[in-house]
């Protein structure tokens, strides 16, 4: 989703935002990166680079990783931990509209994928804590009071995670 501040963009409704697995915010490039971008466009080298691109993964490799991810184990106590975090978004005074059950499913899937990327076949509480802000930030609508106090969805998510007891 493009930033709302950009002319010609429209804010997506909550129901559509909820269908995105995660929100990852990209900042501006560094000075050096921006000069590299300019150089690519100045010399038309970007066209040459496009011709030399090779896929990182084949379709078969991607599907294989998906099957591996489905085999990553999530203990029932961690499923409850995920559900408790998401439930907190629905009762927090800082949140006007909390996350739906789809957010719980997304957090579980993202945690499994992250665990797999870390070389494990099981999810830990740390995996859940890591992915939670990315999974929840676009799903939460804060109250006007929370926004006036300088809270962001990421900050609220962090506070909610801190309130939920970590399974042992």
Protein language model annotation of sequence segments:
Residues 28-39, 52, 70-74, 144-168:
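Non-catalytic accessory segments flanking P-loop/AAA+ NTPase cores
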Residues 10, 18-20, 28, 77, ...:
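Broad hydrophobic/π-residue packing in well-ordered secondary structure
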Residues 50-104:
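Conserved AAA+ ATPase small/helical "lid" subdomain
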